[in-house]
From Swiss-Prot:
Name of the protein in its database record: Regulatory protein PocR
Gene disruption: observed consequences: Increases expression of the entire cob operon about 90-fold irrespective of the growth medium; expression retains its sensitivity to vitamin B12 repression. Cells lacking this gene are defective in aerobic and anaerobic degradation of propanediol.
Pathway involvement of the protein, from the record: Cofactor biosynthesis; adenosylcobalamin biosynthesis [regulation]; Polyol metabolism; 1,2-propanediol degradation [regulation]
UniProt-listed GO biological process terms: cobalamin biosynthetic process; glycerol metabolic process; propanediol catabolic process
InterPro entries reported in the protein's UniProt record: Homeodomain-like_sf, HTH_AraC, HTH_AraC-typ_CS, PocR_dom, Tscrpt_reg_AraC-type_HTH
GO molecular function, one term: sequence-specific DNA binding
Native organism: Salmonella typhimurium (strain LT2 / SGSC1412 / ATCC 700720)
Amino acid sequence: MISASALNSELINKIAQDFAQATGLAVVVVNIHGDEISELFNFTPFCQLMRQHPQHSTRCRMSDRCGGLEASKSDQPCIYRCHAGLTDFSIPLVIAGHLVGFVLCGQVRLSNDVELVNILNVDDRWQADPELLNEFRNVPEMDYSRVIASADLLKLIVENCLKKQLNFVVIKDNPQQSEANKTTRGPTPHDSKMKKALRYIDAHLSDDLRLEDVASHVYLSPYYFSKLFKKYQGIGFNAWVNRQRMVSARELLCHSDWSIASIARNLGFSQTSYFCKVFRQTYQVTPQAYRQQINENSHPPSL
C-alpha cells in the first residue's frame, strides 16, 4: 500500500510517458525494493510476458533493484545487461538527500558488440519457452551511442525536473503493521515521526545506520527515540535494522548472483564474517548453505 507520503504520481507518469514516446525505450519507476510505482510505458511484449511469469518476474524485479543499486553508488546512470540479456539503464532518484527509488529504461538489444555490466548472471532457462524466444527476437535493436545519449538525457530530466518538483517520498508501508496499528490504536502525534524514521532506515540499509542519526532525522533525543521505537515496533532499533537487512539479504541470495561479500557490503556490513553470523542467527543456516539450498530446489534433476 502506498503511504500518504507519496510522490506526485501524475508528474512521474507524465515524464516517463513522454520520455518513452520520444526515445522508443521502455520506462518504469521503481522504489528501492524494485517494486513498480509508476505505470509501465512502452514495455516490449517479451518483457510483459516475462513479468507475468512467477519465477521470471522475480528475477526481473531483482534485476531492477540491483541495477538501481549499482547506479546509486556513483549517482550516475548505469548501463547494464539484465538477467534475460537485454540492455537497460537506471537513474537513481534521490529526494531531499534520500535514495527513494530508480528510474529504469531500456529493453533493447544492442546492434553493436559492447561489453556491459551483467547486473545478474544471464539466465537462459526462459529460452525453453518458444513464445518467449520468438518475442525476444522481436525486441528492437539500438546503437550503443544512442543508449548513452538517452541515459544522459534522462539524467538531466530527473535532476532538473523531477527532483526539484517532488517534495514527498514513495514507500511501501508494511500492510500487516498498518492494519495492526489501525486495530489497536488511533493515530498519535508520533505516528508521522515513526513513518519518517522507518523510511529513513529503509533507504539507508547500506549505510552505517546509527540510532543517533535516525533520532536526529526526526528531531527526537536518542533516549526518547529508542523508547518510542521499541514501543512502536516491538523490538529495539538495532534488532529491527538487522531484521530488515536479513530480509533483503535473503532476497539477494535467492534472486541475485552477487557474492556474499558484495551482499554484506551493500547491506551496510563492513565485515562479511559478522554478516554471516547475523544471518545464521536469524535463519539457522549460513548464507552459502541457504543459497545452495535455493539453487538445488530451483534446479530439479533431469530425468
